[in-house]
Amino acid sequence: MVSVPGPVSLIEPLSGNTILVIKINALHVVKRSKYQEIIIADTEDFGRALILDEYIQSSYYDEAYYHESLVHPAMVTHISPRDVLILGGGEGATLREALKHSTVKRAVMVDIDEDVVELSKKYLPQMHQGVFEDPRAQVVIEDGFVYVEKALKNGDKFDVVIMDLTDPYSSEIAKQLYSPEFFKKLVGLLREDGIIVTQAGNSFFFPEAYDMVLHGVKSSFPVVAEYNVWIPSFGYAVNYIIGSLKYDPTSLTAEEVEKRLKERGVKTLFYSGKTHVGLMNLPIYRKIRHV
């Protein structure tokens, strides 16, 4: 750890006109990998954080808001998720949440950047909580696009695909994984009642990028649900999109969600039955936008 001798801040661009300034207390990692700049730092307000190419990916104090909202709405909507594919999520928190579901027999996490995974194992224990040692977990260091094409050729099948990638507008690495063509490939990777969920960045600052992802999901899935969650360390509400071949996440009651969480032994800090119902009810301005 390197203590910061004076006032040092992360200046994160939220848009072309707005920035978020976050005070840094200590630096644990500053490294440029083959793909991106990696920083792991202790922040004043959000605790330890993983920062990629100047964007906070997750932080100790609010990561549960992000990861639980990404994982559990889709997982709970599926009646019995056994095989789960995670694209991205190198810090291990998405894998951690997926494996809370006792129905899961296999969770494959595919991340292109081995440095992110290895540095997270060492410096972000509160994120992964030892999940990499779970016998149900498989970690593959590979481009997600390449992995999916190989899995299709091999006839592999999944019940749930979780896309925990960098934003479609903040990095070049993941852009092709948000394309309509890629979502069509994911349909081929799913069982007949499969579900995907992706984080889709921020629709307030980047509506065109968000709409691109939304239209891509809608072009491949008969059931689509949108929701968003405010993440303090991001400085904005993150958008999520679910694409489902059968089950409708908006049809679940709070009681049904709680029943499935209890049956599967899932304990959470943010997500609940009432939270699920609230997430699936878009604000008026979002509903109007899609009329």
Curated annotation (Swiss-Prot):
GO terms for cellular component: cytoplasm. Pathway: Amine and polyamine biosynthesis; spermidine biosynthesis; spermidine from putrescine: step 1/1. InterPro entries: PABS (IPR030374), PABS_CS (IPR030373), SAM-dependent_MTases_sf (IPR029063), Spermi_synthase (IPR001045), Spermidine_synt_N (IPR035246), Spermidine_synt_N_sf (IPR037163). It holds the Pfam family Spermine_synth. S-methyl-5'-thioadenosine binds at Q36, D111, D143, G144. Disulfide bonds: none annotated. Signal peptide: none annotated. CDD domains: AdoMet_MTases. Keywords: Cytoplasm, Polyamine biosynthesis, Spermidine biosynthesis, Transferase. It catalyses: S-adenosyl 3-(methylsulfanyl)propylamine + putrescine = S-methyl-5'-thioadenosine + spermidine + H(+). The active site is at D164. Residues 5-245 form the PABS domain. Its EC number is 2.5.1.16. Spermidine binds at H67, E91. It is found in: Cytoplasm. GO terms for biological process: spermidine biosynthetic process. SUPFAM superfamilies: S-adenosyl-L-methionine-dependent methyltransferases. GO terms for molecular function: spermidine synthase activity; thermospermine synthase activity. Its main location: cytoplasm. Homodimer or homotetramer. Belongs to the spermidine/spermine synthase family. Catalyzes the irreversible transfer of a propylamine group from the amino donor S-adenosylmethioninamine (decarboxy-AdoMet) to putrescine (1,4-diaminobutane) to yield spermidine. HAMAP family: Spermidine_synth. This is Polyamine aminopropyltransferase. It comes from Pyrobaculum islandicum (strain DSM 4184 / JCM 9189 / GEO3).
